[in-house]
Amino acid sequence: MAEERSKDDIPDWWEKEWVEFRYRGYTLGELMKMPIEEFIELLPARQRRSLKRGLPSRHKKLLRKVRRARRLLRRGKKPPVIRTHCRDMIILPEMVGLTIAVYNGKEFKEVKIEPEMIGHYLGEFAKTRKTVEHGGIGATRSSLFVPLK
């Protein structure tokens, strides 16, 4: 958790793209330069407690992939879509601008991370249930396999 982000990690265009966005009074550029321990104090209580207890190995693995993609982005290359099952990972400022495919139980849903998503869970953006659009046969799980003549 004591990893520092260097100022070289942040491209020059980064602050210009999301100038008007602020999280708890800090711009995205300031959040990117901030040490992770300082950023944790800005989060709501549930997320703060979760991060203070330490990250499980699967979350650390996801962060390694995010940092690898961020390095590719700095070099001017398009980073690959990062696939993960970690629905309970909290979105951190270093994830902004990347595309993460989150598993919803059936398939991977691509989520483009925006600054407004900071502090939320990845699973909030990959719905596990389909919304019902009609009330006929097949609308509910119990009527999915009713023969249609």
From Swiss-Prot:
Disulfide-bond pairs as recorded: none
What SUPFAM superfamilies does this protein's entry cite?
A: Ribosomal protein S19
Q: GO molecular function, one example? A: rRNA binding
Which GO terms fall under biological process for this protein? ribosomal small subunit assembly; translation
Provide the alphabetized UniProt keywords: Ribonucleoprotein, Ribosomal protein, RNA-binding, rRNA-binding
Q: What is one GO cellular-component annotation here?
A: cytosolic small ribosomal subunit
- Do the record's keywords include Repeat? no
InterPro entries of this UniProt entry? Ribosomal_uS19, Ribosomal_uS19_CS, Ribosomal_uS19_euk/arc, Ribosomal_uS19_SF
Name the source's superkingdom.
Archaea
NCBIfam families given in the database record = PRK04038.1 (NF003121), uS19_arch (TIGR01025)
Q: What role is this protein assigned?
A: Protein S19 forms a complex with S13 that binds strongly to the 16S ribosomal RNA.
Tell me the protein family, please: Belongs to the universal ribosomal protein uS19 family.
State what protein this is by name: Small ribosomal subunit protein uS19
Species in which this protein is naturally found = Methanopyrus kandleri (strain AV19 / DSM 6324 / JCM 9639 / NBRC 100938)
Identify the coding gene: rps19
